[in-house]
């Protein structure tokens, strides 16, 4: 049975959920009253034994045992174990519900795809849907206690009308040592193919859709069979059960109220009813009972699935849809809103308060001033920015600056390998001035000539063929005629790696600023090329070789 209380909690009001505590069927009281009575009986029996039977020495020994149990009882991770276990059981329970076979989609397809209002067509449709119901009954009979009690043998299925005598004999001839719940689905598939070959099903697309739905129902039945076969590991269930019961066995001794005259910590009061121990019993033991009830929803508990009702409903609805409702349509008539573009269904007096206007969006409730609705031109926007944004105190606070403002980059320096020792500042300054003179001296020199063409950025040509000149001599080029720039460049190529520092003063005009940026970028490229070329010839001073120039 299934306990339905949805209507009682439809509205969250005062006492709506509290009224559920008065229910008996499916309640925690019905599940726990037996264990609770046993626990209370044992608790007060131990209490009477401690108060009236034991001697003073025995009472002292019992008190030590009670303090020991109460101090170590919290080491049992009962909340941790129960939380994971109940979560696993509830997810498994819901998955089994989702795999319950409902033939509604299949009966709609059979009623519409299988044509013919004659005796043969009617027999074909009823037989197809009866095979589907028979497959569901066979699997539910295998996993549900209530269904098995209703149909204990296959002969009872014949008497109930789910199977004919010929089908019963055909099923017995198979002689398989396995469950035969899958046989009606095979009959359904073969009969559907026969109906297609006989012209009862027009198209292969319709046949494929019918087969897909049958395979879906067969898969759901297989899932239920697998859930019934593969249970939650027994060791997990045993661990949870032992943890809960051992916890409350320790509570029988550890939660006893000791003699308050002996000043034991936590035992200043001598109560008769252990209120919080009883509440803890209801919570933890009820938590375990939830898992015990949901671990197999095909039993006869109050919250188990109504499998017998499902069988009755599926048979009645399916036969009606494929037989009495086949091609039995009501006459088509114009609806009452035929000429209305926006129909307004009426409300009753009880539902008038639930009428609402259409939701247009959250921004439709925003109201703007009249001056905020005026359109601005670009010139007015720029003027307003200059007057109110850049010159105001708030604009300065927010860091708003005009477009023609440039950051005052003074004494912009690029220092490489230069010590910050005060004694060497003069040497660094002289070296920087000398480096700047060298840069301006070779400003017009094309330094890309020392780089092979296939290594230049943007060049896609391969390396040149090896020259016929020896390695010690440079190959002549068109740029090495007379006293050209190549002589000066050779001097640079023999220089060691230098430390270059550029002192750039940014001009105020934008044009000079751009030119200075290009000069800064070119100087940085010059330094990188000099460094790369110097590293590629580490022993040129000793060997006295000259670099090979490429065009």
UniProtKB/Swiss-Prot annotation:
Residues 52-60, 256-274 are extracellular. Keywords: Calcium, Cell membrane, Chloride, Chloride channel, Ion channel, Ion transport, Membrane, Metal-binding, Phosphoprotein, Transmembrane, Transmembrane helix, Transport. GO terms for biological process: chloride transport; detection of light stimulus involved in visual perception; gamma-aminobutyric acid secretion, neurotransmission; glutamate secretion; protein complex oligomerization; regulation of calcium ion transport; regulation of synaptic plasticity; transepithelial chloride transport. It comes from the Eukaryota. It is a multi-pass membrane protein. It catalyses: 4-aminobutanoate(in) = 4-aminobutanoate(out); L-glutamate(out) = L-glutamate(in); chloride(in) = chloride(out); hydrogencarbonate(in) = hydrogencarbonate(out). Residues 459-489 are annotated as: Disordered. Ca(2+) binds at residues 10, 293, 296, 301, 304. Residues 1-31, 83-237, 289-551 are cytoplasmic. It is found in: Cell membrane; Basolateral cell membrane. One of its GO terms (cellular component) is basolateral plasma membrane. Residues 346-379 are annotated as: Auto-inhibitory segment. The keyword Ligase does not apply. Residues 465-475 have a biased composition (Polar residues). One of its GO terms (molecular function) is ligand-gated channel activity. Inactivated by sulfhydryl-reactive agents. The keyword Membrane applies. InterPro entries: Bestrophin (IPR000615), Bestrophin-like (IPR021134). The chain crosses the membrane at residues 32-51, 61-82, 238-255, 275-288. Its main location: membrane. The C-terminal auto-inhibitory segment (AS) modulates the open/closed conformation of the channel. In a closed conformation, the C-terminal auto-inhibitory segment constricts the channel concentrically by wrapping around the channel periphery in an inter-protomer manner. To allow chloride movement, the C-terminal auto-inhibitory segment opens partially, leading to significantly smaller chloride movement. Belongs to the anion channel-forming bestrophin (TC 1.A.46) family. Calcium-sensitive chloride channel subfamily. Interacts with YWHAG; this interaction promotes the ligand-gated L-glutamate channel activity leading to the positive regulation of NMDA glutamate receptor activity through the L-glutamate secretion. Ligand-gated anion channel that allows the movement of anions across cell membranes when activated by calcium (Ca2+). Allows the movement of chloride and hydrogencarbonate. Found in a partially open conformation leading to significantly smaller chloride movement. Upon F2R/PAR-1 activation, the sequestered calcium is released into the cytosol of astrocytes, leading to the (Ca2+)-dependent release of L-glutamate into the synaptic cleft that targets the neuronal postsynaptic GRIN2A/NMDAR receptor resulting in the synaptic plasticity regulation. This is Bestrophin-1. It comes from Mus musculus (Mouse). The gene is Best1.
